[in-house]
A protein has these predicted regions:
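HIT superfamily nucleotide-processing domains
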Residues: 1-137
Length: 137
């Protein structure tokens, strides 16, 4: 799709994320706003809006990708909990936000903000975070 950052990549994706790698049926993206260290997005490989738009097999593989990403986040960053968000009314591409939460830290026991615009990293810090995640995939 023409205006979809997940589909087009490049500058559209760079506004909010950095591609880490491809998984079985999705791409793993580091969310640039890192108020929750280790926050990522798992975006389905094709431009579909809903889970019901893909086959049972593809849906199962998509959730395997979500679980793979969650395991990597748990090992790399040791959150107390990972929150999962699937919204998409602003951009209809099937994706999940995986948001590590840390007890007694930012937004613990509350719903996470989509983009609090509080924490951005240097290019070197993003690269380190990406390598840390990749090491545990």
């Amino acid at each position: 799709m023409q205006h979809c950052g997940y589909c087009q990549g490049g500058e559209l994706l760079a506004k909010f994320g950095i591609k880490i790698c491809d998984l079985k049926v999705s791409q793993l993206i580091l969310f640039k706003e890192q108020s929750h260290p280790g926050r990522v997005i798992v975006a389905y490989k094709d431009h579909v809006s809903e889970l019901v738009d893909i086959s049972d097999e593809e849906r199962n593989l998509f959730f395997e990708d979500v679980a793979t990403a969650a395991k990597a986040i748990h090992v790399a960053f040791h959150p107390d909990k990972v929150n999962y968000g699937a919204y998409g009314d602003g951009g209809c591409h099937l994706h999940f936000h995986l948001v590590p939460k840390y007890k007694d830290e930012f937004e613990w026991a509350t719903v996470f903000q989509m983009n609090p615009n509080l924490v951005t990293l240097s290019d070197e810090q993003y690269a380190e975070m990406i390598e840390k995640i990749k090491a545990h995939l």
